[in-house]
């Protein structure tokens, strides 16, 4: 994933694009003859012909600040954890295993197994943390449906996945303003 991100960043820079980190978009205004004027935190003002909204769970908030109608994204927490491989077992070529009811999954990951309860719990956009109950549910499902025994997770985390009501992807130019890309 890191290599992919770096490749995208190289391509962005080669095409004259910039990545600005640790900035808050306060507001944005679009003028047909001049493109976007973005007001960022710390008094920074940026001009842009095209605005790409890659804010994930915060994408609707960004759209509103740009005068664009939100699409109704619902951020959902997903919990994951890693755990030890059974002693003497090479799992490097194991496939991803998903429960028939999609109540869990696990797969090889960097010499360990990565598991999840495959949850999608609706939350507000935020820096989410893993819930102990979600980890316990994931461990329970994996142990219940396999012969794996998980003594304890090595590491756990949570992230946000965002969905619209129909479950489809949101990608492409906005219907009302083609200079705003979802």
Sequence positions of predicted segments:
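A generic "binding-loop/recognition-motif" signal
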Residues: 24, 58, 77, 102, ...
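Active-site lid/adjacent beta-loop-alpha segment flanking the redox-cofactor pocket in flavoenzymes
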Residues: 69-72, 85-179
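Central helical "cap/lid" subdomain
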Residues: 44-95
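Helical element adjacent to the flavin cofactor pocket in flavoenzyme catalytic cores
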Residues: 1-50
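Mid-domain beta-loop-alpha active-site segment that forms a flexible
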Residues: 1-11, 56-58, 134-141
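Structural motif
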Residues: 35-37, 45, 80, 103, ...
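Short glycine-/acidic-enriched loop or helix-start segments at secondary-structure transitions
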Residues: 30, 62-64, 125
